[in-house]
Amino acid sequence: FNLKYTDSGRMTANLISPKMLDFSNREFNFIEFPEGAHLDIYDEENKKSTVVANYAIVYNKTGIIDMQGNVVLNTAEQDTLFAEQLFYDQEKEWLFTNKPVTFKTKQDLINGKGFDSNSKFTNAEVLEIDGSFTLDE
């Protein structure tokens, strides 16, 4: 299954999964991907970041994608985030979680509880940090 998301004709996200369950007949409708999902996120410059997870659910009314289980996010800059759960707000193009994460950059390995970032990762922030990281003086 292949689900594309666009904004003003520009593709912002593409969700691919082997199986989709459509619950659009519910009052709070959603689409479930019980066999895992692969999500490509494109920023305004068409740079691609990728998220894979064991399970995903898309809440149609809110535009939130909830990815769970062995979530791995690879940014266009080759940074990697490991988490058990990660949310993507399609409207705000925002990624976030309040679960434990490990964020690996070219020079640092940062552990924390929570993560916030725009889809460009220009303001990626690991919350409640624990681990080694480099400080600019």
Q: Which residue ranges define each predicted feature?
A:
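Mature-chain termini and adjacent capping regions
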Residues: 1-137
